[in-house]
Every structure is written in structure tokens, then in C-alpha cells.
């Protein structure tokens, strides 16, 4: 299980997370997983040498993005318009979520990985935080705290 708390300080513009150029979000927590040739698709395995040239041999294979933003519903899973099938975005809070309040999130990353990619991950490679407002021209201010892994 992965849990954390986050909050946004201002209302974000609704955006379509599935479309390049319209995919802004207030904040996202990314969980990356090591590349696994045994569970990777044919195209992932074919692209891997190029990924390693650009990003290095320790570049992750797949990502789950837990997102605050978009106009979908909490729990919706969307394929990344930039990374395609190797990055599944899961809406935790949409653009109508409360502003200025800490929101607790808890998710089963193993179940999410299996739902997104059809396999069970062996370990996590990285946790990353990001925000994106270049398409809508907005300004995001978000905080994230108490990121923690725990047994189910």
C-alpha cells in the first residue's frame, strides 16, 4: 500500500489528461518500476535500447501516475499521451476537488499495476512529484507530505 497527503492552494483549470497540449494537472505523484523484459510488451522490448541510450540503463520501465486534475472521475485510468501504454495515469482528485484542505490518499500499487499492465511488479524504482500548467497558463501551488509504503 502507498499512502500520502496532498493539498492544492488554488482551483485548477479542468483539462483533458489524455490529450497532448491539454493535459495540465495541479500535482501528480509518480511511481516508477524497473524495466522487466519478461513482462514488457514487444514494442517496449524493441524500444528499450533507444531508451537506454537517452535515459541510461536504470531508466524505469513503467509508471503509475496518481493525479490531482483533469475532468474525469476519481479512479479513472488514462493512458499518458506522452508515454503511451507504459504510463497509466489514475485520477485521485479531479479539478473540482476541495482547495486548501489536506486530502489523504491510499492506494494498492500492486493492484493498480496489475490493472494497468497485467502483471505484478517486483519492486518500485522511484517516487517522483510533478505539476503541469503550461497548457492552460495557470499557476499551481500544491503540497505533498507523509508519503509512506506499508504492508496491506
Language model feature labels by segment:
Residues 5-11, 34-36, 110:
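Solvent-exposed strand-to-loop "edge" motifs in beta-rich extracellular domains
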Residues 20-27, 141-142:
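Short coil-to-beta strand junction motifs in C2/discoidin
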Residues 7-16, 46-50:
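Short acidic (Asp/Glu) patches
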Residues 26-29, 85-86, 90-91, 95, ...:
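Extracellular beta-strand ligand-recognition surfaces/modules
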Amino acid at each position: 500500500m502507498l499512502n500520502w497527503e496532498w493539498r492544492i492552494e488554488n482551483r485548477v483549470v479542468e483539462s483533458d489528461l489524455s490529450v497532448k497540449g491539454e493535459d495540465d494537472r495541479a500535482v501528480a505523484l509518480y511511481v516508477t518500476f524497473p524495466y522487466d523484459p519478461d513482462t514488457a510488451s514487444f514494442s517496449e522490448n524493441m524500444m528499450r535500447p533507444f531508451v537506454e541510450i537517452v535515459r541510461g540503463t536504470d531508466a524505469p520501465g513503467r509508471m503509475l501516475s496518481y493525479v490531482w486534475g483533469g475532468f474525469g472521475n476519481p479512479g479513472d485510468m488514462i493512458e499518458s499521451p506522452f508515454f503511451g501504454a507504459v504510463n497509466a495515469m489514475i485520477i485521485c482528485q479531479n479539478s473540482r476537488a476541495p482547495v486548501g484542505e489536506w486530502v489523504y490518499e491510499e492506494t494498492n500499487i500492486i493492484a493498480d499495476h496489475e490493472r494497468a499492465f497485467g502483471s505484478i511488479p517486483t519492486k518500485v524504482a522511484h517516487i517522483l512529484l510533478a505539476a503541469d500548467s503550461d497548457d492552460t497558463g495557470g499557476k499551481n501551488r500544491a503540497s505533498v507530505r507523509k508519503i509512506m509504503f506499508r504492508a496491506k
